[in-house]
Each structure stands twice: as C-alpha cells, then as structure tokens.
Amino acid sequence: MNPLLEAQTAEELERVWKSPRWNGILRTYTAEDVLKLRGTWKIDYTIARLGSEKFWKMLHTSDYILTAGALTGSHAIQLVEAGLKAIYVSGWQVAADNNLSGNMYPDLGLYPSNSTPHLIMKITRALQRADQIQHLEKRNNHIDYFAPIIADGEAGFGGPLHAFELMKAMIEAGAAAVHFEDQSPSERRCGHLGSKVLVPTKRFINILTAARLAADVLGVPSIIIARTDAIGAQYLTSDADPRDRKYLTGVRTQEGYHAIRSGIEMAIDRGLAYAPYAEMLWFETSQPSLEEAKQFADAIRRKYPGKLLAYNLSPSFNWVKLLDGETLAEFNKKLGQMGYKFQFITLAGFHTLNASMFELAKNIAEQGVEAYASFQSKEIELEKKGFRGFKHQRFVGVNYYDEVLMTIEGGETITALTNSTENSQFV
C-alpha cells in the first residue's frame, strides 16, 4: 500500500501529509500542484519506497545507524553480509572511480550527473542477485539484503530543475534517502577542500523544495538530508538573502563573490533555516569534534526537538592523530546520544579497494604466487565470519543460472558449477 501514490484528490493527499511521518516538514506547494505534475500513470517505485520506509523506521528504533561508502555492487554485498544495515553511495567515490564518463576525477562536480543513479542501480541489482542466490540455496542463516541506500546528490548539479530531475533519477534507481549541500554547483568541491562557495540560504531551500517535489510527484516518502558547508566555506555567491548578510566581510572577489566569516555560528543558522525542508541535517566539519557536534546539535534541537542529524566520519580526517583511543571507542555512541542517528564513513570503498590491492600486489611482486596463496588463507578464515566472496563463481550466481537453464531445458543440461574447479577444490 502506498498512500502517497494512491491519493486521488488534493484533499486525500493533504490528509496523508498530515500523518505523523510528515511532522515538521514544510511544503511550499500544494497537493493540487503535485497531482497536476503526476500524469495518469501510477508507477510505484517499490525499492525506493520500501527502502525509505525501512530507513525511517531504523532511524527511530536504533541508537544510531553506522555504515560505509560502497564503490561497487560487490562492496554493497560485503557491507550487508558483514552486518551493516544501510549502504552509503558517495559522490567523491563516483567521481574517482565509477562514473559514466570513464574518467578519474577529483571531487569537483565534474562527472556526469546520472552517474550516481547508475551506480545505485548496479548496487540494487547486486543485492537482489545475492538475495536470489540465498533463496535458491535455502540457507539457514538468512540475511536481509534489502538495505536502504543513502545517496550523494552533491549540490544538485545546477538549479532547482536539475535537482528535481536528479532526485527523480535517484528514486528510480532505488535510493531511500538523498543528501544535498548548499555549495554553488558551478564551484562545487569536496567538503574538505578549500575555497568553497555557498549559495544564498533561500537558493538552497529552493533546491531542497525541488527534491521534495520530485519525491512527492513520484509518490515516494524519500528522506531528504540537508548539508551545510558553512563551517569551512570562504565565499557566498550573492548577498540577496538578508539572513546571510551578517557574515559578509565587505570584500569581493574578481568573480563577484562575497568573502564571508564562516564557522559554526553560520552553520547553525543555516541548519535552522533548512530544518523545515529536510528530515535530517548534516554540518560538514573540518575535524572530528564531539564538542562542535554537541554545539550544533543543541542549537538545532532547542528549536526543533528530535530533529534527525547526520555525521560524516570522513577519511579526510587523520583519526589516529586527532583522537585518543578512549575517545575513538566512544565516538559513535556519544554522537548517537546527541541525535546523530546516521553516521557514515564516506570513502571506505575507495580506501579498502586501493590499500588491499596495493598490499597484495606488493606481496606478489616480492613472493610470487605464494603471496596469493597466503591471501586465500585469509579469505578462508574470513569465511568463518560470513565472507562469501572466496567461492567467486557461486558468489556471482553460476548456480543460479544453472537452475535457470535446467528449468528451461527440463533438467536435461550440463551445469557450469558441477564440473568447475571451484566445486572440486573449494568445497
């Protein structure tokens, strides 16, 4: 049942919006506006819808949700099989190694905007295949592969219309939640690089509104996350919004941008302005600090009690250098107590892929095939903890397609897995 999509009249849709799920969410448009934009085809985006509903429930029943960034479909399967309950899809990782241009980019908003939806589609299909294989094998230790996907919408890749279309593409691919940030799309860069340029507060609210409208038109209760980069930004594109003017220094750049006094106060002001338009808020930090996190959380929740918060456990931080062991051990728990219900290590996929491959390659260069044999021994040990990638043929579904072929040919066929080296040597 999808009440958002099943509403036939503006009155019915307005009643849905008055349910507890939408408490604290402000829409600047009407239900009639949404119905006018829907057309007559009722398409239920099941993966995104059920993922959003599941993620929403998790946010309200867990101390916090911790996950990492997946760079491939196989990465996503590993996250789930290891016990994580959600999948994060990072724009940085898409730019670096999985975008549709085929190039390696830094996180400067250079890659095609449909790249992240494409990766989400690959991830949902990989998770579905893992579920199909599990179902076929009738495993006793059932794994729920249907993990909500939280995706990076960057700065929207343009204006409100671009954000509207991007949000639609994310939903169509299967995203449960999408975050957008208040940087200028044309100057957009990684949150931990310098010379960041913000858009006016009102302009970003329009981006959030565009994303909400897209979700409403598609009839999906998507979770929208509003991120502010105000702590580390240097410039503002325009002084059009009076709320921003107290942070201007009076200095202009050659491009016409306004230099600003950024910091936690500006981040709080922007978070408060964005709160009615998003389910969750995220302030991008320059270092991991429980004190700074508490300052932001207290200010937001003083006006918006219970507002959901997100925290980037960024690989751009030198965690061992900045925090002692005791602080690290309690970091997630204390963030959760402050209201940071979604915590994520954005670039985990990139770093594990590169570090593990370098380590293996270095050992192979020095030891030959003996190094790979040692690596296999590690995989065998990981199997005891639930790792399934060691038997790679079975992992990708050879047995599944054997079953497909036998079904087509009435059981009279030669199967691929039966006579494989994997079946004879790895069982």
Give each language-model segment a name.
Residues N2-E11:
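Intrinsically disordered, low-complexity regulatory segments in eukaryotic proteins
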Residues T61-I65:
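A short, charged/proline- and glycine-enriched loop
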Residues E326-L417:
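Conserved alpha/beta catalytic core and glycan-binding cleft of carbohydrate-active enzymes
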